Design a protein with these regions (language model features):
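Beta-strand-loop-alpha-helix segment that lines the small-molecule cofactor/substrate pocket
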Residues: 1-22, 36
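Short, hinge-like loop/turn segments at secondary-structure boundaries
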Residues: 8, 32-35, 62-63
Length: 175
């Protein structure tokens, strides 16, 4: 919300790219929903097989030798400069709070894109979450997030009532 307000107040054009938006699938889902072909949507459930990298770990206790091909300081950027460890790089940085956002941050922008666009969702009015053990350094191994979005202005062929959107990762699945 802060970034949305900042972009509006400064006139800076912002855009979040999503490769899933370039295929016809998203347009078809929007067309079906906007034409009322599946009726009013009141619940959406989205899931991923991620993480496919380690999560739910404590921070490593020892440092590893930094590979000659890696500028660890440059990679770390403005994040906390932890001692280098092979558990962070390559690829696995996604699961560590200092560098990534876990499976939710890595995949939800792609998977939830269609429902957000097709259902014209804004900000949720209520969010509930549950997860496996949550540690301070690393995202949990699995989580479920439930978001409630208020009713939106009806479209010509379909109403947009309050909707419940669920996110599942790490093996947590709908009941």
């Amino acid at each position: 919300r802060l970034l949305t307000k900042l972009a509006a107040s400064t006139g800076v054009v912002t855009q979040m790219g999503n490769q899933g938006a370039s295929g016809e699938g998203t347009d078809l889902v929007c067309e079906w929903i906007w034409n009322g072909e599946i009726g009013e949507v009141t619940k959406v459930e989205c899931a991923t097989d991620r993480p496919i990298w380690p999560q739910g770990l404590n921070a490593p206790e020892k440092a590893d030798r930094i590979p000659n091909t890696l500028n660890w300081d440059l990679f770390t950027g403005p994040a906390k400069l932890n001692p280098y460890n092979n558990v962070y790089h390559p690829w696995n940085w996604r699961g560590w709070w200092d560098y990534g956002t876990g499976a939710l941050g890595d995949m939800a922008c792609h998977i939830l894109h269609q429902p957000f666009r097709a259902l014209k969702l804004g900000y949720p009015t209520k969010v509930e979450g549950s997860s496996t053990l949550l540690l301070s350094a690393c995202a949990p191994q699995a989580q479920h997030v439930k978001m409630i979005f208020p009713a939106r202005d009806n479209m010509p062929k379909v109403a947009l009532p309050e909707v419940e959107v669920h996110w599942y990762d790490g093996g947590m699945m709908p009941e």
